[in-house]
Amino acid sequence: MTDVLIRPARLEDADALAELGLRTFLDTFVAPDGFAIPYPEADLQPYLDQSFGAEAVRRRIAEAASGYWLAERDGVLLAYANAGPNGLPHPDARPGDQELRRLYVDKCAQGLGLGTKLLAIALDWMTGHSTGPLWIGVWSGNLKAQKLYAAHGFEKAGEYEYPVGAWRDHEFILRRG
């Protein structure tokens, strides 16, 4: 087994990233051994298609104003991070601020430190591309993620309702800077 390689995502990674994102979302938020959020199927499936379809991932990778990184071992994707212009609904948010959009680690790779490594890369990139604070939206029940972000200087700055179809997840808005 080779070491884990962390690198920028490429367009040809889109299909594998879409599969990893979908699997990680379902394992984390929907599965009985995850948070088991009872999303109605009518809300969940369109959200999954919109968020984790290969074409949507290709568009995000191609965005000039965003950064996208992945961790892989032996050609198998284990984790990824995506950052770009802030889109969180906070009154202090300004054009030029940056947001960590996603930080996903496959269930089989948790505990390897990949989330922390990808977060550090994303934060360096965000700092270099931001004219103001850095932002993260995190589900209110995901205490593990909140603890990781707090260890990197993020503090709760607000709350909002994140739409998954008509369903709403209660999210915290975190800010650093």
Which residues make up each language-model segment?
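Short glycine/serine/threonine-biased micro-segments
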Residues: E19, L77, G111-G113, W135, ...
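Conserved glycine-rich acetyl-CoA-binding loop
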Residues: R102-A120, H129, S140-K147, A151-H152
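Acetyl-CoA-dependent GNAT
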Residues: P8-A14, A18-C108, L119-W125, H129, ...
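Extreme N-terminal starter segment of soluble prokaryotic enzymes
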Residues: T2-L5
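C-terminal "cap" of GNAT-fold acetyltransferases
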Residues: R94-Q98, G132-G177
